[in-house]
Regions:
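Conserved small/polar residues in nucleotide/adenosyl-binding loops
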Residues: 137-139
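Conserved SAM-binding motif I beta-strand of class I
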Residues: 100-105
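Conserved class I S-adenosyl-L-methionine
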Residues: 71-80
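Conserved SAM-binding loop of SAM-dependent methyltransferases across substrates and taxa
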Residues: 81-96
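Conserved SAM/SAH-binding loop
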Residues: 129-134
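Short alpha-helix immediately C-terminal to the canonical SAM-binding loop
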Residues: 110-112
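Short, conserved SAM-binding/catalytic segment
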Residues: 115-125
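Class I SAM-dependent transferase core
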Residues: 4-69, 120-121
Length: 139
């Protein structure tokens, strides 16, 4: 992962993203590529590492500026393949490890992937298999 690209975002830059964090993001890219061969984690059109980095990792990293560090939880509604939730969880390991990231996803297969990634990377996440938007219809 090119630190110059990641460091172009204010909070990420101010905290000087560690080599370890960049390595974890690279591991995530590899896991996405591998699992995407079996199930549709991300668009099949975006399969090269550089495209995944730019389209998903870097785009997702931008949200770090909007995570309120005064709270101990944040959530990603309809996380799909884990963007931005997994990226936030990876970066939060260094910023505020106690923050739990709740990832809501309706796809059973994607939830399994999210749980595998979270466990393998020791992320502070909770994967919730639920169509959150379906619940809102009854409100």
């Amino acid at each position: 992962m090119d630190n110059a690209i990641l460091n172009s975002y204010s909070k990420v830059s101010n905290l000087d993203v560690s080599r370890e964090t960049c390595n974890e993001l690279e591991s995530l890219v590899s896991m996405i590529q591998e699992k995407n061969k079996e199930i549709n984690i991300i668009s099949k059109k975006i399969y090269e590492k550089e495209a995944i980095r730019e389209r998903h990792i870097i785009d997702s990293a931008q949200i770090i500026d909007f995570v309120d560090l005064n709270y101990n939880t944040t959530c990603d509604l309809g996380t799909g393949g884990g963007m931005p939730g997994l990226i936030v969880a990876i970066v939060m390991k260094k910023i505020k490890n106690s923050m739990k990231i709740h990832l809501y996803e309706k796809s059973h297969h994607k939830c399994i992937f999210l749980k595998e990634v979270s466990k393998k990377m020791n992320l502070n996440t909770e994967i919730i298999h639920k169509d959150i938007f379906l619940s809102l219809i009854h409100i």
